[in-house]
Amino acid sequence: MTASLDHRFTEFLLESQALKFGEFTLKSGRKSPYFINAGAFNDGRKIARLGAFYAEKIVEEIEAGNLPKDVDTVFGPAYKGIPLGVSTAIALTSAHGMEVGYTFDRKEKKDHGDGGMMVGTQLADGMKVLLVDDVMTAGTAVREVIPKLKAEANVEVIGLVLSVDRMEKTKDSDTSAVKAVEAEFGFPVFAIANVKEIFEAGQRIQNADGTPYVTPEIKAAADAYLEQYGA
């Protein structure tokens, strides 16, 4: 029997050393006992596998009727979203037969050559754009990129796919960052896995010495953190 998507993705996070345990200060200022380091996906094999996971999640949501079948382009916000968007578009085409473009933004407008703020598939009115990003903390990146997209063309943003949903409430409410973005922009947000699924799987996945990656101590620290900040 094939393991679930969230279980296989957790294995990948652990094998890639992208899931770290300890004490980490997040952008929000919160002290977290775990951290997802997207910088660990730093070679061709890892980024190809990561794109395959994103593509699998996207196809799963299309088949469930939660996303439309006709995605025109996958958009990854600069800088971390660029390899995510490109690798996801490649995987959607090569593994799932979908003809889909990729697009990303420039941080600074180019004043020579083709110019403009966008690279890749150029945006046009009516296009269906699917966003990809790594981990959402407060939704800042989404709020920055939506106006950029709308300034280019009257596109339809059909959804956002994350690698991990941290399932945390925002600073000023008990609503999760994911739910806040969904309510504000009107499109669905999906994640390959959420932190509860990851810690559940991590207790069953073993190190080379036979011990679980997620020990009772690590799980207790994560539970305490989510008790305080979880949504």
UniProtKB/Swiss-Prot annotation:
Task: Cite the Pfam families for this sequence.
Answer: Pribosyltran
Signal peptide boundaries: none
Tell me what reaction this enzyme catalyses. Answer: orotidine 5'-phosphate + diphosphate = orotate + 5-phospho-alpha-D-ribose 1-diphosphate
Q: Cite the annotated pathway.
A: Pyrimidine metabolism; UMP biosynthesis via de novo pathway; UMP from orotate: step 1/2
> Which InterPro entries does this chain map to?
OPRT, Or_phspho_trans_dom, PRibTrfase_dom, PRTase-like
Q: Which cofactor does it need?
A: Mg(2+)
Q: What is this protein called in UniProt?
A: Orotate phosphoribosyltransferase
The protein's organism comes out as Bifidobacterium adolescentis (strain ATCC 15703 / DSM 20083 / NCTC 11814 / E194a)
Lineage, opening ranks? Bacteria, Bacillati, Actinomycetota, Actinomycetes, Bifidobacteriales
Q: Which gene encodes it?
A: pyrE
